[in-house]
């Protein structure tokens, strides 16, 4: 199984959460999205950007296209997701991968495309 890594998992890793680091080590062939890249970089201190880009570049980035944008709009409306979360979900669904997240507020396991690898 391949996975799309949600931003919160990488933030946990960068903050030294061992469960996140262990999960990432076991799933090195996972993907990120342009959403994750932007969210991590916007919150980064200037001195951290190089190491964060190095981490991000270690994953293949799945792109966004019109099919994904259309599905994101549907998911946003149906599940009342924030737009970035709707895009993450749409990218996972279209690419037939699981979205790995710790965000149980917006994503529910029963959505089918979600994997919650650990809890804090």
Label each residue range with its predicted role:
Residues 1-32, 41-57:
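Short, well-structured N-terminal submotif of metal-dependent ribonuclease cores
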Residues 6-7, 40, 72, 92, ...:
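Generic structural signal for small/hydrophobic residues in well-ordered secondary structure
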Residues 31, 62, 114-117:
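General small-molecule cofactor/ligand-binding pocket signal
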Residues 58-78:
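Acidic catalytic patch
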Residues 77, 81, 97:
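Short glycine/serine/threonine/alanine-rich loop segments
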